Regions:
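Proteins synthesized as precursors that undergo proteolytic processing into mature forms
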Residues: 33-56, 60
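Divalent metal-coordination and catalytic microenvironments
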Residues: 12, 23, 58, 197
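Polyanionic/metal-chelating signatures
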Residues: 59-207
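Histidine-centered catalytic micro-motifs
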Residues: 20-28
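Histidine-rich, glycine-flanked metal-binding segment
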Residues: 1-16
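Feature captures the catalytic cores and cofactor-binding loops of soluble hydro-lyases/lyases
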Residues: 29, 34-38, 196-199
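Extracellular/periplasmic bilobed ligand-binding domains
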Residues: 210
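Protease-associated
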Residues: 16-17, 29, 176
Length: 210
């Protein structure tokens, strides 16, 4: 091995592969963009902090990779970032480029703001009924957005004298879900709400990752 590489005698020791944390908030201090119910356009990778001491401590415990997720304050949260734990690296160097893209969803108490206090319960939804409707409204809009861009891409010549469809970063992320390019990681509490999300996914033809 190179001279600057530490060699450890593993005789009599137990060796395991590096651990992977599938749901982490390490290296990201701002994880909840909770000002509205849908924030699919925000990205955890934009706020990664490679100097977070948690990275060093997790490496010491055998963790080598983590799925950094948006928080669970809203029904459709932000986009994830899968990172390799590299202490001393830059934020961009943490990103694992071969990972499937993901996004955080949440159901139940967090998103309907249970026990937040009367001063902090002004955002829709406030019930599980509303959570379902948020999802259905969002994916209905995403389907329409998908159709507009599909029509434009199939025959762009007809758009020469027209303005192309306006880009919407929020809806783009949802279209990626519909097209199987982005996995959903959903925080949930109860069986009934899990079944609700399953029904919505069946109606719109997408799958839930976790």
């Amino acid at each position: 091995p190179p001279k600057d590489v530490m060699v450890i005698d593993g005789t009599g020791k137990h060796i395991t592969p590096g651990l992977i944390d599938c749901h982490s908030h390490s290296a990201a201090f701002s994880i909840n963009e909770g000002t509205q119910s849908i924030t699919a356009e925000v990205r955890i990778q934009d706020v990664l902090n490679s100097n977070d001491i948690t990275i060093y401590r997790e490496l010491a415990g055998g963790l080598t990779m983590a799925n950094i997720l948006h928080g669970s304050a809203n029904t459709i949260g932000g986009q994830n970032a899968v990172i390799k734990l590299r202490w001393g690296a830059t934020p961009d160097a943490l990103l694992y480029s071969n990972a499937v893209k993901g996004i955080k969803f949440a159901l139940g108490e967090n998103v309907k703001q249970s026990n937040w206090g009367d001063d902090n319960t002004t955002r829709y939804p406030q019930t599980r009924m509303g959570v379902e409707q948020i999802l259905r409204d969002a994916f209905t809009s995403a389907v329409e957005y998908q159709k507009k861009w599909s029509g434009y891409n199939k025959n762009p010549k007809q758009w020469k004298k027209k303005v192309p469809p306006r880009r919407d970063l929020e809806l783009e992320a949802l279209v990626e879900i519909l097209e199987g390019q982005r996995q959903i990681h959903c925080h949930s509490y109860r069986q009934d709400e899990i079944l609700m999300l399953t029904r919505v996914s069946e109606d719109f033809g997408f799958t839930v990752g976790t």
